């Protein structure tokens, strides 16, 4: 497996970062509005240009409207320096250079990473707008219109020219090694959990360069199985950005999950399920990762005989999209139940890689359809001719049907539940895709 390079968009609110993000990613997955500081849920996407692909993050998406603008731009620049291979500093040509732009520039000048200045909203006067922004001290300045697409091709040419010559290759990992990311909000105990695992598992532990960058993975060998904890160095170092900006944890979680098969989502049980917990859980599902939910700081909870059941039900209620994920109660601080993580990891890894025979898949789908036929849509009814599994990690099934548009989400969930009932799939999302059955 290889890791794509990362490009970060930086800039004050309302300079057009969202419009440029959408232009590069090629689909409208973020809100574009003229109100300064409009926030978005989606902050990552995939960019492709001239045969190169890269991860794209919009650092502006990690802020709320009420955040101070100067605080925003400085932290954006720090996030970009921390996470990106190439930084695109987006400005507004019509406004000229503002104090916030100067703050960003001052921070970015401290890095050795390549910085491109994209002077947006330069319609009608591209050369003149670009000249002013050379004052910020960067060599490459390009005037663009993200809205109309003018010169965005030139910008992308420059971006791919600056990307690392090769994708970061993972070293010495075997397909059977279990790749794990520890994800969650700041201060939920991620570094404590890693340290406790390493202290408890007095086994073969080695630190490996996870990529040709400076990420360090920790490899544990246990009963002939290798477990690779991704970027443990990054987890152990306290990020000043994390401390000041909780939403930065979403970017960190995205990056950790890119290389993992299974994500361990750590939640502080004393705080309950917060919005960032929900976002990070949703990312794990969206990216098709196996998932284990770890309720940390269980030692700090006053317990009666029903405490475990109560918290279990709360998690299921608050995180319905990942109701397949096993839930564990533990204390990273005291080590309680930490040693029980590995058998659950083994189980989820097996389920994530599970393959079902075509005959068994069709038997379950046929029984499900006979028991509850597909609902009609505009007077037409979905017909499912046959099904087969086409991928693992996550398990993915294709249904050959008369018309994919007749598949309702509610019926797809019903079929997913029937597959789970028959085959398990604990801890892993499953995908169902529809294809038109070709006539002979």
UniProtKB/Swiss-Prot annotation:
- Superkingdom is Bacteria
Where GTP 2 binds, per the record, is at: 184-191, 231-235, 296-299
Q: What is this protein called?
A: GTPase Der
The alphabetized UniProt keywords are: GTP-binding, Nucleotide-binding, Repeat, Ribosome biogenesis
- Give each disulfide bond as a residue pair: none
Q: Which Pfam families match?
A: KH_dom-like, MMR_HSR1
NCBIfam families for the chain: GTPase_EngA, small_GTP
Q: Report the Gene3D superfamilies cross-referenced here.
A: 3.30.300.20, P-loop containing nucleotide triphosphate hydrolases
Q: What does this chain do?
A: GTPase that plays an essential role in the late steps of ribosome biogenesis.
Q: Does the keyword Nucleotide-binding apply?
A: yes
Q: Which family does it belong to?
A: Belongs to the TRAFAC class TrmE-Era-EngA-EngB-Septin-like GTPase superfamily. EngA (Der) GTPase family.
- Indicate the segments forming the KH-like domain, all copies: 354-438
Q: Which SUPFAM superfamilies match?
A: P-loop containing nucleoside triphosphate hydrolases
Subunit-structure text? Associates with the 50S ribosomal subunit.
Q: Does the keyword Repeat apply?
A: yes
Which terms under GO biological process does the entry name?
A: ribosome biogenesis
Q: What Gene Ontology molecular function terms does this protein carry?
A: GTP binding; ribosome binding
Q: Which InterPro entries does the record associate with it? A: G_ENGA, GTP-bd, GTPase_Der, KH_dom-like, KH_dom-like_a/b, P-loop_NTPase, Small_GTP-bd
Residues bound to GTP 1 are: 11-18, 58-62, 120-123
